[in-house]
Amino acid sequence: QALAVPCGKEDGGAFAYQPGKKGELVANNDASAAAVLGLLGKGMAVGDANAVKDPVCTKGDDLTAEQSAQNGAHYLAATLAASPYLEQPPMPGAEDAEPQPDFGNTADAVVSLAASGHKDKATASVKWLEKNAGTWAKQGGPAASAQLIFAAHATGADARDFGGTDLVKQLNATGPSPAATALPSPTPSGPQPSSGTESDDGGLGLWWLVGIGLLFGAGIGFLLSMRRKKQQP
């Protein structure tokens, strides 16, 4: 809870990336989405589940992991209620000084809301991603496609027709080819397995590729974060 913004304050329930120079906590969308999943003990491959009661922000210094996660979900739900997408500040030196849509963290927030039982709070965001994230996913490489696949999977959307884009095919096209699913050893009396490999849609191969994509994206995000810190006075 050391990085959680207390409920009742501005952006209450959110999580900070790290304390400021004076110990202040500033809400960070990336940290908030990740904290919700981490506190719930869930990974990115969250299954589609029915929504439960609305998230609440619980005050206190001795909260359970579940309560802290729900606080984070409360912040994400409130933020996405005001706008279907999260924003990111402009890069230092950028010509456009206005905040830009943050496709990646919006997708991650969708997964976190679904994981915490608030899929209904992410409905508008999923629709927004379907309509607007196509170009970003193509330019962002495997990590971007993977994030959208997870968001679709968590909310019951079709990853093979996400705003007209087959995200699975797009991810597979980045390579390497999906690994074939292991087949049982044949027995003299049993059926003989097919000699071919799984199609490019193979379940194990898909999630393996998704994992590789997210690791790649995490590395890029870390490098950008370090670059921003170096450019700050």
Protein language model annotation of sequence segments:
Residues 1-50, 61-71, 78, 82-121, ...:
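An alpha-helical repeat/solenoid feature that recognizes helix-turn-helix modules
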Residues 1-3, 76, 129, 171:
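Buried hydrophobic core positions in alpha-solenoid tandem helical repeats
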Residues 54-60:
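Primarily N-terminal secretory
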Residues 49-54, 122-134, 161-175:
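Alpha-helical repeat scaffolds
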